[in-house]
Regions:
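Substrate-binding cleft and catalytic face of glycoside hydrolase catalytic domains
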Residues: 1-172, 210-211, 297-302
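Surface-exposed alpha-helical segments enriched in charged/polar residues
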Residues: 37-48, 97, 101, 145, ...
């Protein structure tokens, strides 16, 4: 599985050199033909390599032109999709109709569209003008349904996802409209969605460890065992999956779309934490994929004390790099057994759903990686 970030305003762009005019419901919309062709090539290459492709659609807060009709402006980086105006709503319909046509066929199939980033934290990641949660989710649910209808009209295999972070019952700004708890956001969103006709949403969840810096998620003190837990991390991810199964239904799927583990306490611990988290996701039938957030960490991560990458800022491979390469192979459990001493387990089969035979039908690794040493 591969998750890509795509900028809406780079695709819907009348200032490009090679324009493609798309007519939708009597209006014309201008797309960047070269950009779209490049994205199609990118998707096709991943598909040819055997990967499913998922795309996060992001709208910059300073988007201009036709894309700007969908933007609220303000916030830090990204805007939520503005469907409260006729122009914004119609533009979003046109955009998703176009994207479904371009990326709904077998050669260029986007298997999932993730709308925005961490929508429960609108000020930081999905600004919507400081609205109440109810008004915000009215808008977001409308955008979600438009995307759902557009993609499903072309491909029954494509899904749409809401993006959420780990603040399950934690309201960061204490009742303001800049941040909302994940659970209230999910509940309100699903209520709004059902009110206009039931469809099955999917969730792109970010399962970082508590505080982001400390890698050992099994020690997360705020991650409890019940639905009243403050946060949900890999320690208690089953709280999320069980809640979604009961609230939305067993057909809803959860993608762990972004998480990474710090290497500041040693590369062996980082590798062990990743293997542990991956196996938890593998053993949970409601989790469809686990996406590691960083290949090579950027300077902005390092500046905050986040040394998350499979490779460091200079491109040097950390121990987690080889763990990542073998994690879903036939030899997975054997190649990672030396990492157990860095966890609170004595065997990976202590994880629910993991058996010695779990990976027996998977591909065998081509390169014979030695067991990771301490």
């Amino acid at each position: 599985h591969v998750v890509l970030n795509w900028s809406i305003e780079e695709i819907l762009n009348k200032d490009c050199g090679n324009k493609e005019v798309y007519k939708y419901r009597g209006k014309k919309y201008t797309f960047d033909r070269d950009r779209v062709n490049w994205l199609q090539d990118q998707v096709r290459q991943y598909i040819d390599d055997g990967s499913k492709v998922y795309v996060i659609l992001l709208l910059g807060k300073d988007a201009k032109g036709q894309a700007g009709k969908m933007s609220y402006g303000g916030g830090k980086i990204f805007s939520s999709i503005k469907t409260t105006s006729a122009a914004g709503c119609r533009t979003w319909e046109a955009f998703m109709s176009y994207m479904a046509e371009k990326f709904g066929n077998e050669q260029h199939l986007v298997s999932g569209w993730i709308l925005g980033n961490e929508v429960d934290s609108p000020y930081d990641w999905n600004y919507a003008g400081g609205k109440s949660l109810s008004a915000y989710m009215d808008d977001y649910a409308r955008a979600f349904r438009i995307a759902y209808n557009a993609t499903k009209s072309v491909s029954s295999h494509s899904k749409v996802y809401i993006s959420l972070d780990y603040n399950w019952n934690q309201d960061v700004d204490g009742g303001g409209n800049s941040f909302f708890s994940t659970k209230k956001t999910l509940d309100t969103f699903y209520s709004k969605l059902k009110a206009q006709g039931k469809i099955c949403p999917n969730i792109a969840y970010h399962a970082y460890s508590q505080g982001l810096v400390e890698p050992k998620f099994w020690d997360d003190s705020l991650a409890g065992s019940g639905v009243d837990s403050t946060i949900i991390t890999m320690k208690n991810i089953s709280v999320l999956t069980e809640y979604v199964k009961k609230k939305i239904g067993k057909d809803a799927t959860i993608m762990l779309a972004e998480q990474a583990f710090n290497s500041t306490q040693g590369e062996e611990l980082q590798a062990a934490t990743y293997a542990y988290a991956y196996y938890i996701s593998e053993g949970n039938k409601m989790i469809e994929s686990f996406i590691y957030a960083r290949d090579t960490e950027p300077q902005s991560d390092v500046d905050q004390g986040f040394y998350w990458g499979l490779r460091d800022i200079n491109g040097r491979e950390r121990k987690i790099y080889n763990t990542f390469k073998v994690i879903d192979s036939k030899e997975s459990l054997d190649k990672t057994k030396n990492l157990l001493s860095y966890t609170d387990l004595s065997s990976w089969t202590q994880i629910p759903g993991i058996k010695k035979s779990t990976f027996k039908n998977n591909r065998s690794i081509k390169n014979k990686w030695p067991p990771l040493q301490s």
